[in-house]
Design a protein with these regions (language model features):
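N-terminal targeting leaders of membrane proteins
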Residues: 13-103, 107-114, 118, 122-126, ...
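Short loop/turn motifs that connect adjacent beta-strands in outer-membrane beta-barrel proteins
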Residues: 39-45, 122-134, 175-185, 224-236
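Small-polar-interrupted transmembrane alpha-helices in polytopic inner-membrane proteins
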Residues: 56-57, 131-151, 167-170
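Alpha-helical transmembrane segments that form the membrane-embedded catalytic/substrate-binding core
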Residues: 106-113, 150-177
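Transmembrane beta-strands of outer-membrane beta-barrel proteins
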Residues: 138, 142, 185-187, 234-240, ...
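Residues on the lipid-exposed face of transmembrane beta-strands in outer-membrane beta-barrel proteins
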Residues: 171-175, 217-223, 271-275
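Transmembrane beta-strands of outer-membrane beta-barrel pores
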Residues: 191-195, 242-248
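Residues that define the transmembrane beta-barrel architecture of outer-membrane proteins
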Residues: 211-217, 263-271
Length: 276
């Protein structure tokens, strides 16, 4: 009888001990897969994103500094030539440079930069809204820094219009997250080298992003994204493109031949399906 009582007591004791031990040991949270966004802020990921961003920004600055800002410096000035804040919105040569197609280029480039920042921040555990907002702010800051550097360049100048275009592009992903209509709209870029006019002039094989004569920017619309319940194929969109032709002469004001054809050139428009 004592043996039976002892066995029952042991089973009860082990059961109680196991229950108490399970209650005191916290559950181990499954590790988030590397390529999956963290649910909460992951300090290690956040630090890695910051370190990678700083390295990328430094590398980009080093490249652009040699490509764009290697000339002798001037005092700070706006694109219109003046240095007073009241002259910030004066139209300079920037107003006719590349038939203003570069404004779309600033928008598109900033949108890509902002999206990269936002994806990294989201991966580290921030919410979607926080990530897109921070992406917009950081993208705008990068655009502002570029324009400030341009403000000291003898070739360029701080362009308020370039900065505004870049800022809109930086916040476009955030605006898309808030608008059903904007989710169906996107900006895309294509490059096809159909002539060498630009490269024949600059005498080097670089800076293709400034070769607007061979560049096309597309505004795409996908009806399925606007109304998922529609029968419109989700892989098919409609695109309207814009570019400039090879008559776009004298990219820079100091080009041989003077300024008589500065700002000339014709637009090219395209209509095409957008197959995703």
């Amino acid at each position: 009888m004592r043996f039976i009582f002892w066995m029952v007591s042991m089973v009860f004791s082990v059961s109680v001990f196991a229950t108490n031990e399970a209650d005191t040991i916290p559950a181990i949270k499954p590790k988030t897969p590397f390529f999956k966004n963290a649910d909460t802020l992951n300090v290690k990921r956040f630090a890695a994103v910051n370190a990678t961003s700083l390295l990328a920004l430094y590398g980009s600055y080093h490249y652009i500094n040699n490509a764009w800002w290697a000339d002798s410096k001037k005092t700070f000035h706006f694109d219109g030539g003046g240095s007073r804040i009241t002259q910030a919105f004066d139209f300079g040569r920037d107003a006719i440079y590349a038939k203003s197609l570069d404004k779309i280029g600033h928008f598109y480039g900033a949108r890509i930069t902002s999206d990269i920042f936002a994806r990294g921040i989201r991966w580290s555990g921030k919410t979607e809204a926080q990530s897109l907002l921070w992406g917009g702010l950081l993208g705008t800051a990068v655009q502002g820094f570029i324009e400030i550097k341009d403000g000291y360049s003898p070739t360029w100048g701080f362009s308020v219009y370039d900065w505004m275009s870049g800022s809109l592009g930086s916040f476009y992903p955030y605006f898309q997250s808030k608008s059903k209509f904007l989710k169906a709209l996107d900006i895309k870029y294509s490059y096809y080298r159909k002539d060498n006019y630009y490269y024949d002039f600059i005498k080097r094989e670089s800076n293709f992003q400034d070769d607007y004569m061979n560049s096309t920017f597309w505004l795409t619309y996908n009806p399925h994204r606007f109304k998922p319940s529609s029968k419109w194929p989700k892989w098919l969109g409609i695109s309207v493109g814009i570019g400039v032709d090879h008559t776009l002469n004298n990219y820079y004001i100091n080009m041989p031949g003077g300024t008589s054809d500065w700002g000339k050139g014709g637009y090219e428009f395209y209509l095409a399906p957008d197959i995703d």
